[in-house]
Amino acid sequence: MERNTNPNRQPVELNRTSLYLGLLLVAVLGILFSSYFFN
């Protein structure tokens, strides 16, 4: 039972981490673009 719960939770965490990383990347890109436009 424990072995089945672990693999199921891992993919969910990976998906959430990937989403958070994507949001962070978008934020960084937005800041970079804004800085370029302001300059």
UniProtKB/Swiss-Prot annotation:
Subcellular localization: Cellular thylakoid membrane
Transmembrane domains' residue ranges: 18-38
An annotated GO cellular component: photosystem II reaction center
A Pfam family hit: PsbL
One GO BP annotation of this record: photosynthesis
Keywords, comma-separated and alphabetical: Membrane, Photosynthesis, Photosystem II, Reaction center, Thylakoid, Transmembrane, Transmembrane helix
Topological type in the membrane: Single-pass membrane protein
Coiled coil: none
Assembly, per entry: PSII is composed of 1 copy each of membrane proteins PsbA, PsbB, PsbC, PsbD, PsbE, PsbF, PsbH, PsbI, PsbJ, PsbK, PsbL, PsbM, PsbT, PsbX, PsbY, PsbZ, Psb30/Ycf12, peripheral proteins PsbO, CyanoQ (PsbQ), PsbU, PsbV and a large number of cofactors. It forms dimeric complexes.
Reported function: One of the components of the core complex of photosystem II (PSII). PSII is a light-driven water:plastoquinone oxidoreductase that uses light energy to abstract electrons from H(2)O, generating O(2) and a proton gradient subsequently used for ATP formation. It consists of a core antenna complex that captures photons, and an electron transfer chain that converts photonic excitation into a charge separation. This subunit is found at the monomer-monomer interface and is required for correct PSII assembly and/or dimerization.
Family (UniProt): Belongs to the PsbL family.
HAMAP family documented for this protein: PSII_PsbL (MF_01317)
NCBIfam families: PRK00753.1 (NF001972)
The protein, known as: Photosystem II reaction center protein L
Lineage, opening ranks: Bacteria, Bacillati, Cyanobacteriota, Cyanophyceae, Oscillatoriophycideae
Chain's gene name: psbL
